[in-house]
Amino acid sequence: MVQSSEAHGPEGRGGQDPAPVRRARLSGSVRLPPGYEPALFLFTPRGEKLWAEGWDPRFPAPAGDDAEPGTVFETSHGQVRTTWVVSAREPGRSVRYARIAHGRDAGTVTVTLDGAGAATVEYDLTALTDEAATGLARFAARYPEFLQDWEQAIADAACQPPA
């Protein structure tokens, strides 16, 4: 469930795609399966592979601890290549990534466990082009469904036998 969201750009255009936004600050919660430990692992580069279809981080330098601040990795989604840097971590509680989706947007993603079976997921993104501002507006409008998809994928993965 999205707790709050804020997008900066022109006002909406009644019934059409959302108006382009240059910056979006989005926050919402994802419920986690009961007893899943360590829960923060689900939101590390390697841990996300357990539940995020198509997620395949590549590390340009060896990374024994993939959530160590300073760790760099890359992902691809369609034609968009994204470079990620672990910028902060509080072990067992939170992790923050800086990310640049080349030619599209840049910003941070922060995941914080609440200690009661949920994670708060915050995106703070800035569009790098006019075209990206339209895509960012669509992402912001769909953020609640985006997190619901995450929640369902995590729940489905928790029900799978270990590989």
Show where each model-derived region lies.
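Hydrophobic ligand-binding cavity/cleft-lining segments
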Residues: 2-65
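Compositionally biased non-globular segments, especially hydrophobic aliphatic-rich helices
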Residues: 10, 160-163
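Short beta-strand micro-motifs in enzyme catalytic cores
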Residues: 24-26, 71, 95, 109, ...
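Short, surface-exposed coil-to-beta transition loops
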Residues: 25-27, 79-84, 104-110
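Glycine-rich portal/gate segments that line the openings of hydrophobic small-molecule binding cavities
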Residues: 31, 47-53, 58-101, 156-161
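A short, structured loop/turn motif at beta-sheet edges
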Residues: 33-37, 87-92, 112-119
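Beta-strand/loop substructures that line and gate deep hydrophobic ligand-binding cavities in soluble
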Residues: 98-152, 156
